[in-house]
Regions:
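N-terminal targeting sequences that direct proteins away from the cytosol to non-cytosolic compartments
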Residues: 1-90, 189-214
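Extracytoplasmic
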Residues: 66-70, 103-105, 150, 181
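Short, surface-exposed beta-strand/loop micro-motifs that present aromatic residues
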Residues: 89-94, 167-177
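A short acidic-to-branched-hydrophobic micro-motif
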Residues: 92-122
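Short, solvent-exposed loop/turn segments that connect beta-strands within catalytic domains
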Residues: 98-102, 162-166, 176-182
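Short, well-ordered beta-strand elements
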Residues: 106, 181-191
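Solvent-exposed loop/turn segments at secondary-structure junctions
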Residues: 114-115, 146, 159-162, 190-194
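Signature of long, low-cysteine stretches enriched in small and polar/charged residues
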Residues: 124-174
Length: 214
């Protein structure tokens, strides 16, 4: 069942934020004829790892919760709203454009953060890490421009997932709410092969993300 499969992906993504690897370029070789043993480069700390390391509590929020922050994403034609599949706030997909056993998908998480934090520091230092830590990630574009007046990191790229090259666009936004903060995580995913054909859909989704406070 399609919704069950996407729900499983949502749970895995939330539980495994930051898994994967990044392979930056190697430095120029030395003149020595003896090969040197080098440790693999350290992965950047994911958003989730960093928040836990500084004692910030992380609680997924559903649309039915009394949270003061709401997230809306208008869906292009052919996309279906599958609702809030815990822990995701919203999951949508386009079943008519399945490719290599996958449907294009859009996933939103709304996460309540408890504890003091510097939102701009978190975004600037860890906003790209979840994407960078995916398998064989290749960046296409990124931005640290604010979104709707809030600290934000957006990144687009491709990575390998179970033998399929995936094209993903992601945005993290941290919204202050008194002593609390809310983290909005939004990802739109297609296969690399269909990314050009679905570029208008992706643009409508990513440009339509709306964050409101009560």
């Amino acid at each position: 069942m399609r919704s069950a499969a996407l729900a499983a992906v949502a749970v895995a993504a939330f539980a495994m934020i930051g898994c994967g690897s990044q392979n930056p370029g190697q430095p120029a070789g030395s003149a020595s004829g003896t090969p040197e043993s080098t440790a693999p480069p350290a992965k950047p700390a994911s958003m989730n790892e960093y928040l836990h390391s500084v004692g910030v509590t992380v609680t997924p929020v559903s649309p039915e919760s009394p949270a003061n922050v709401r997230v809306d994403v208008p869906l292009p034609r052919g996309w279906e709203n599958l609702g809030a599949l815990d822990p995701a706030y919203l999951i949508a997909d386009k079943p008519s454009d399945a490719d290599q056993g996958r449907t294009p998908s859009a996933v939103v998480y709304l996460i309540k953060l408890g504890g003091p934090l510097d939102a701009r520091k978190v975004i600037s230092e860890h906003g790209f890490a979840d994407a960078q830590n995916t398998q064989n990630f290749r960046k296409i574009a990124s931005s640290l421009d604010d979104y709707q007046g809030y600290p934000s990191a957006a990144i687009e790229g491709t990575y390998e997932n179970q033998g399929v090259r995936v094209h993903a666009w992601s945005r993290d936004v941290i919204v202050p709410d008194g002593p609390l903060h809310y983290l909005v995580q939004f990802t739109v995913t297609t296969t690399e092969a269909q990314s050009a054909a679905l570029s208008q859909d992706v643009a409508a989704l990513t440009g339509g993300l709306k964050i409101t406070k009560r």
